[in-house]
Amino acid sequence: MERTTMMRSVLATALALSLTACGGGGGGSNVRIDPPAPPVPPPTTPPPTTPPPAKPQEPTFDAHLAVTNARAAQAAGLTGQGVRIGIVDSGVQRNAVALNGRVLANFNYIDPARNNLGVDDVVGHGTAVASLAAGAAVGSWPGGIAPGAQIVSARIISDKPPTDDGSGQGNSFSGPLGVAQVHQDLISYNVKVMNNSWGGLYWTDLPTTAQVAAEYRPFVISHGGLVVFAAGNDGRSEPSSLAALPSQKGVAGSLPAADLERGWLVATAVDPYAPGTLASYANACGQAARYCLAAPGSAVYPDAGGGSYYWNYGTSFAAPLISGAAALVWQRFPYFDNNLVRQTLLGTAKDIGAPGVDPVFGYGLLDIGRAINGPGRFDWGDVVANVDAGSTNSIWSNDITGGGGLVKQGGGKLVLVGNNSYAGATRIERGILSLQNGGVIRSNVTILGQPDPDSTGLQFNGGTPRVIGDVTNGSSVFLTTANTTGTIEGNYTQQAGAQLMIALGANALQVTGNAKIDGGVRVHGMVTGYVPQNGARQDLIHAAGSLSGTFSTPATSTGLQGLSLVSSTYGYDSKNAWLNLTQVSVTAAASGLSTSAQAAAQRVQGAFAVLDGNPGLQGSQFGAAAAALQWTGGGQQGLADSLQSLSGQAHARAEAATFDSIDMSRRAIAERFDRVQAAPRLRGTWQSALGEAGQGSFAGNTADSRGWMAGQDLPLGSNGLMGVAFGETRSNGGSSFGGDRGRDRQAQAQLYAGWTLGRGYALAQFGSGQFTRALDRQLLLGAGAYGVSARYGGRFSSASVEGGYRFGRAGASLTPYLGASSTRVDTDAFNELGGFGFGLRGDANRVQRSQMLAGLRGERAWGRWTLRGHAEWQQRLDGRDADWQASFVGVDAWAPLAGWDAPRGSALFGVALESWWGRNGRLSLGFDQRVGGNDARQAALRYST
C-alpha cells in the first residue's frame, strides 16, 4: 500500500500559526485511562494542572459506538471499505496500530522551520480523530466507526497551539484561506469525505466569503466530496465562521457559498451520558441547522502504539464519528452522490431537543443504524436515485417523509420497504422501483416509456404493497411473485406500448379507482407450485370503479422464462381483465423434434394429465417442477433442450455400448486367431488392448471404451486351436451422451475354438459376463438445471461362429470372412434419485439380438512399421428390440427410451499404423468410422510402453 510524506507549499505563516485543533475554543487535553478489564478496577483520572470549569464525565470505551447506533452497521458487515477519508488536522501517525496499512499519504503544509516534520503527528490530535473515524479495534477499544476506510492526512495545524487575538473566536484573516492546494491533493487521492476538526479563524470583511468558498468548490461541486466541520468549542449559539461557511454572507447580502451546502455537514456535540443534552463546551448549530447534526463529543481512543488509552472531548471528536458514518453510507450505497449521503445522515438523525429541525441540534443525533438503511427525509427537494445496473441489494427501508419527491434513474433496481409519506411525486425514468414486503408510497407515480419496457417499471413484491395515488404506466408494472397483493389506491392508466408483467398464479392488480388500459400483457413464468389446467383463468386487473379500454397487443412471454406450453387469450368485463389459459399439447409442440425428445414429450404429457386430475399433487415438489418445466423459454430450441434432458437417452446409449463392447471382444479374439493361423509359433499366452483406434477392437458406440483381454491358446488336434480369455472394458460417455455422464465397467470370460484347413478357417466363441453402470444426468426444468443419478447393473451371454480364408503371408495378408452371432443382455431395474420426481425409473429388461457378419481384415508390415485395416458389415436377423419403457419417478407416465433400438444394418471401418520403438515402446496412429445407426468415429495417436 502506498505511503507518502509530501511537503506542500506552506500556508501563510500568520494563518498557519492561527489554526487550532478541537474545532477552536476550549476543548479537552488528552487524558490517559486504563481499559475496563475486571477484576482490576480502572485508576482514577489524574486531574490536569488547570482543570476546565465544566469538564465532562469520562466516557465508556464504546460510547461513540453505542450512542450513534453504530453496532447495527457492524452487524450488517459495513466497514467503510473502498471509501477514503481525508483528515485535515495535525497529521496522522501512519504506523498507528489502529490505522496501520490504511494511511495512504501524509501531506504537510506547515513550516518545517517551526515544526518537527520527522514525526507524522506531534500533537496527536489528528491521529485520535482518524482513529475515531476509521480505527480498527485495539485491545479493549472496540474500534472506530468505519474500520475499513482508508485515510489521507493533510497536516495544516502547527505543533504549538496559537494565541487568541482577544475576540474569543481565534484569529481573523481576510482573502483566501490558502487551502486550495490541500483540496487538490485530496482530490488526487479520490478522497470522498474531508474531516475538519479544527478552527480558530474568522473574518469580518464580506468579500472573503466568496474567496474562501472558491477554495472549497472544486472538492464539493466538481469532485463530489463531502465536507464535515466541527462546530467549535466556544459554547456559543452559532458554529464557527468556517463551519457555517455555506450560510456566511457576502457582498450586498449575497450568499456566495450557498451552493456548498449540498456537500457540507456541521458537527455539534452531545454528552454521551445524556445524549439529549448539548455538551457544555459545544457551539450549537445556529444558522447551519439545515446541514447540522450532533454526535457524542467525549470519546476514548488508543495511542499510536496501542498500549495505552486516552479520552478527550470537543466537537473535534464528534466530527469524525459523522465522517465515519458517511463512509459507511457510501459503502452501502455506492451510487449516492455527496448530497444524498448528506441528506441520508441528516434525515435519519434522531430528533432531540425541540421537535423538528432546531437551532441547537439541527436535525438531531447521528443514528448510523438508520442511515445505512437509506434516506429518511426528502427535505431538500426531489431526490434522484441513479441506481446503476451493477448495484445489488439497494434497499431503502426507512419510512421516508418530507416535501420532496423521488426520481428513479439508472438501470438497477431500488427497493422501498417502509411506509413512505413524502409529499412529492414519484417518477420512474429508468430501471425498476420495487415496493417490497408491504412497502407504501403516498404519491402519484409516473413511469416513463422505454424502448425495452421489461427493464423499467414499478414492481409489487411481497405482502400488500400499496401506492396511495394515481399510477400512469408507460413501461411496466410487475406482479411476478407469490403472496403479493399489489394495490393502487387511486386510478391506473396503462398507455399504448406499456405492459402489465405478471406471473401465472400471481394475484391481480387491485385498483380502488378506475383503470384505463392499452398496451399488452407479458407473462413471466409461474408462481412456484402452480400448474395451469385447461380452461384456467389468470386475473390481471380488478378495478373497484370501472375498467375501460382493451389490451391492444397479444400476450407475450419473457425470454428464458417464457411459456412454451401454455397459450392465452384476453377476457374482460366492466371491472376486470383476465387471461384465459389453455394448456398446449406437449406431444404436438414436439412433433418436429428428435425421436428421443418426442418420447420425452409423451412422458411429460402423461405427467401433466395426472397433475391436472390431482390438485393435491400440484402443490408437491413434483408439481413445482412441472410448473418450472412450463416456464421453458427459448422457443422451439428451448423446448427441445428440455425434452432431450428428460428423455433418458443416456440409458439407451449405455445399453447400446454394452452390446458394442461384447462385439469388440469377439473381434479381438478373431484377430488373435488370424495371427496364430499365420504364425503358429505365436500360440500360447497372449494379451491385447481393447478400444485402440483402427485395430479392429473399436466399440463403435458414442462412448469412449477402453480395456484389455488376456488368454491362453491350447492345441486342438493337428489343425485345431482352443483357448480361454478374460477381459475388462470401461466405457465413459460424456457430451456424446447428450450432456450426461455415464460410466460402465464390464467383465467377461470367453471360450473359443478354431480349425484351419489350408488357408481356410472356422472359429466358434462362447462368452458371458456382467456389468455395473453409473449414470449422472442433468434435467432442464424451466430456467433451472437439476441433477439425477442411478446405479445399476446386469449380465450378458454371447455365442458366435465365423469362417474365412486368409490370402498372403505373415508380413502381408488379407482375410475375408462370414459369420453370425447371438447376444443376450439382462439389465436390472433402475430408479434415478433427484430431480423432484422427474428422474426416470425402468423395470428389468432383457434383449436378445442375432446378426449376420461379413468382413475383411488386412495387414502389411515394413520393418518396424505395420499397417492394419478392417471392415465389417452387421445385419440384424431378428426384428426390432422390444421397447424399453421408462416412467418418471414422481408419477406413472411411461414411454419408450428412444435411441435404444439397434439399426437393421451397419458397417465398421478402420485403419491403423503401428511401430515398435526400442524393446518396449509402441507408437500407433489409427482411425475408425461406424456407418448406420448412431454414426461414430474415433481417431487417436498414442505412444505406450
Predicted segments, located by residue:
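Extracellular S/T/G-rich loop segment that most often corresponds to the catalytic His/Ser-adjacent loop
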Residues: 89, 97, 247-327, 331, ...
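Subtilisin-like serine protease catalytic core
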Residues: 37, 58, 71-107, 112-174, ...
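Substrate-binding/access-modulating region of protease and related hydrolase catalytic domains
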Residues: 23-35, 79-80, 136, 156-259, ...
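Outer-membrane translocation/initiation segment of Type V secreted surface proteins
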Residues: 32-33, 335, 347-397, 401-403, ...
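Outer membrane beta-barrel translocator domains of Type V secretion systems
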Residues: 617-814, 822, 924-945
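Extracellular beta-strand/loop-rich repeat segments of large surface/secreted proteins
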Residues: 457-539, 545
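Extracellular repeat-rich scaffold modules on cell surfaces
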Residues: 305-308, 315-316, 320-331, 379-450, ...
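Outer membrane beta-barrel transmembrane domains
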Residues: 750, 829, 840-945
